[in-house]
Every structure is written in C-alpha cells, then in structure tokens.
C-alpha cells in the first residue's frame, strides 16, 4: 500500500513539473506574439495562454500566434545562414587579402556558371568521341605510336649493337620493360664488348676515347691544315725511327702500341 502511494506521489510531481514547463512555454510564446504584433486586439495574452494550455478551445488568438512563431523561426534560420556566409567571406578576405575583395565575386559567378562535377569531367572524352567520331581516336593513336617510336629510338640510340644485347639476353621484352623500362636497353651490351670496354676504361679513362682512335690525327690535320704537317715533319719521328724504337723497347710497344711513337 505504501509503495503504491509513493508511485502516485511521484507521478503527480512529474505531471506538475511538466505542467509548469508547458505553462511557462505557453506564457513565453504568447508574450512574444503580443510583442511582435503590437496593439492588435485579436491577440490577447491571457486567452492565448489558456488556449495553448488546453484550458480553452483553440481559437483565433493561439492560431495567429502559432503562425507568427513559425514565421519567426524561418527568419531566424535565414539570418543564421546569412551570418555564416558573412563569416566565410570575412575569413576568405582575411586569408587572401585584397585579391578576394577584388576578384571574389567574379570567381564565384564563374564557378556558378561553369561548375562541373567529376562525373561530367570523366564524360568529356566520351562526348568528344561521339561528336568527332574516329578522328579523335586516330589522333590519339598516332600520338601514342609516335611516343612509342621516340622512346624506342632513345632507348637504342640508333646503335646496331643493341640487337646483340637482345639476342644474348634471356629475358623477354616484357620482363625487361617491367624491370628496367627503356633505359637499360640503350646502354647494356654483349658480355665480350662489356669486358673489353671496361678494361680500356679502367686503364686509360676518357683519355683513350679522345686520342686512341686511329683517325684522331687526321682530324687534327684537317682542323689545323698545313701547320700540323710542318709540325709532324719537324718534331715527330718517321716510321723507320718508330720501328727501330719499337724493337729497342718491346715492352713499351706492347703496352702502348703505336701511340708512343708520337
């Protein structure tokens, strides 16, 4: 019995508190309506409050107040959006200085007129293909073929020895492209040529590339004309002297060849 009485008391307290809150909200809403509408006779604060609490049948006073409250909420939402836009504009002006102040409206207008979604960007190629038929495809294929041909020429550098590398290499072209791309094809050679070149490079460096060629002397003669001819006649030994020198110094001849005659 005591437990039921306790539950009833708790229920009455909760109902009373809710009634007080509802009464306070109704009084506040009706007072706000009376303040906004001014001295209109059809709005009576007391009647509006009683109608809101349900003590009187709903009449014109509470209905007019509800409409006014809805309009007020809409205005508050719009004011909040304007305030947010103003804050964004102020932040952009603070970040970018006078640039946004000068060109911001123009950029915003252009974005509204020509704004494109990512799906529209992806569909741009399809639209071109539909409008121009196979023309765009041919241009794309020709550009791709030209790029592949140029890459192949740069990779091989026009050197016929590259075919030797392709014959001696056990890897397939697909594996080569996957591993090195087109870079290593132009610089790797056969095993014999690599050993010979590395030995000369290790021993003489870049010096032999300039003067170790048989035609290097002819190049100088063509470049300097009769001056080099007179120089060779005056200072350089003849072939007979060079042969005698080679016989006297076989080690030098073996090591440096005909280069030491000069």
UniProtKB/Swiss-Prot annotation:
Main location: secreted
Protein keywords: Cleavage on pair of basic residues, Disulfide bond, Endorphin, Neuropeptide, Opioid peptide, Secreted, Signal
Signal peptide stretch: 1-24
InterPro entries xref list: Opioid_neupept, Proenkphlin_A
UniProt modification remark: The N-terminal domain contains 6 conserved cysteines thought to be involved in disulfide bonding and/or processing.
Residue ranges annotated as propeptide in the record: 110-131, 139-177, 190-201, 211-221, 229-253
Subcellular location: Secreted
Superkingdom of the organism of origin: Eukaryota
Cystine bridges: 26-48, 30-52, 33-65
Record's GO cellular component terms: axon terminus; dendrite; extracellular region; neuronal cell body; plasma membrane
GO BP annotations, alphabetical order: chemical synaptic transmission; neuropeptide signaling pathway; sensory perception
Any one GO molecular function term: opioid peptide activity
PANTHER family (alphabetical): PROENKEPHALIN, PROENKEPHALIN-A
Function: Enkephalin neuropeptides compete with and mimic the effects of opiate drugs. They play a role in a number of physiologic functions, including pain perception and responses to stress.
Family named by the database record: Belongs to the opioid neuropeptide precursor family.
Name of the protein in question: Proenkephalin-A-A
Source species: Xenopus laevis (African clawed frog)
């Amino acid at each position: 019995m005591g437990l039921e009485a306790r539950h009833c008391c708790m229920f009455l307290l909760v109902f009373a508190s809710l009634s007080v809150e509802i009464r306070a909200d109704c009084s506040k809403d009706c007072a706000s309506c009376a303040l906004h509408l001014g001295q209109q006779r059809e709005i009576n604060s007391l009647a509006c409050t009683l109608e809101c609490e349900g003590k009187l049948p709903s009449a014109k006073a509470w209905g007019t107040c509800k409409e006014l409250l809805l309009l007020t909420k809409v205005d508050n939402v719009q004011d909040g959006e304007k305030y947010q836009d103003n804050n964004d504009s102020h932040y952009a002006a603070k970040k970018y200085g006078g640039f946004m102040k000068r060109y911001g409206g123009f950029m915003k207008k252009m974005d509204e007129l020509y704004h494109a979604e990512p799906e529209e960007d992806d569909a741009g190629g399809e639209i071109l293909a539909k409008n121009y038929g196979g023309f765009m495809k041919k241009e794309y294929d020709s550009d791709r073929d030209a790029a592949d041909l140029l890459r192949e020429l740069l990779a091989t550098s026009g050197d016929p020895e590259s075919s030797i590398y392709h014959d001696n290499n056990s890897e397939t072209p697909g594996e080569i492209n996957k591993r090195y791309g087109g870079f290593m094809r132009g610089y790797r050679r056969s095993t014999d040529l690599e050993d010979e070149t590395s030995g000369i490079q290790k021993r003489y460096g870049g010096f032999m590339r300039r003067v170790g060629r048989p035609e290097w002397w002819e190049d100088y003669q063509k470049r300097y004309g009769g001056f080099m001819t007179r120089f060779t006649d005056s200072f350089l030994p003849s072939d007979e002297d060079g042969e005698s020198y080679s016989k006297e110094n076989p080690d030098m001849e073996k090591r440096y060849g005909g280069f030491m005659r000069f």
